[in-house]
UniProtKB/Swiss-Prot annotation:
Family indicated by similarity: Belongs to the parvalbumin family.
The keyword Phosphoprotein appears for this protein: yes
PANTHER family, per the entry: PARVALBUMIN ALPHA
Keywords for the protein's UniProt record, in alphabetical order: Calcium, Metal-binding, Muscle protein, Phosphoprotein, Repeat
Organism, scientific name: Cavia porcellus (Guinea pig)
Highest taxon of the lineage: Eukaryota
Record: residues binding Ca(2+) 2: D86, D88, D90, K92
Biological role: In muscle, parvalbumin is thought to be involved in relaxation after contraction. It binds two calcium ions.
Residue numbers of Phosphoserine PTMs: S19
Gene (name only): PVALB
Name used for this protein in its record: Parvalbumin alpha
A cellular-component GO term for this protein: cytoplasm
Domain notes per entry: AB domain, comprising of helices A and B, is involved in structural stabilization, protecting the hydrophobic core of the protein. It is required for high-affinity binding of Ca(2+) and for Mg(2+)-binding.
Annotated residues for binding of Ca(2+) 1: D47, D49, S51, F53, E55, E58
Domain EF-hand: start-end pairs: 34-69, 73-95
Amino acid sequence: LLNAEDIKKAVGACAAAESFDHKKFFQMVGLKKKNREEVKMVFQILDKDKSGFIEEEELKFILKGFSADARDLSDTETKRMMAAGDKDGDGKIGA
């Protein structure tokens, strides 16, 4: 679904603390070029508890969904991404 080399580069680009930019990351892994169904498939992989949503606790570990040896997001990075993705303010990101 996503190119392994693109994922490796994207994870490497945000290896430093506080360097994660969700827009840049998703562009680098190729999600911006995927259709809605393909994006939904990736979302389902990242939705670890299969609730249909990505909650803040899952979001903290989102990079590990792409690469097992990736770092966790900081609280600041997690909150920034949640604010960008949580369109209705319920503390979750839907597909």
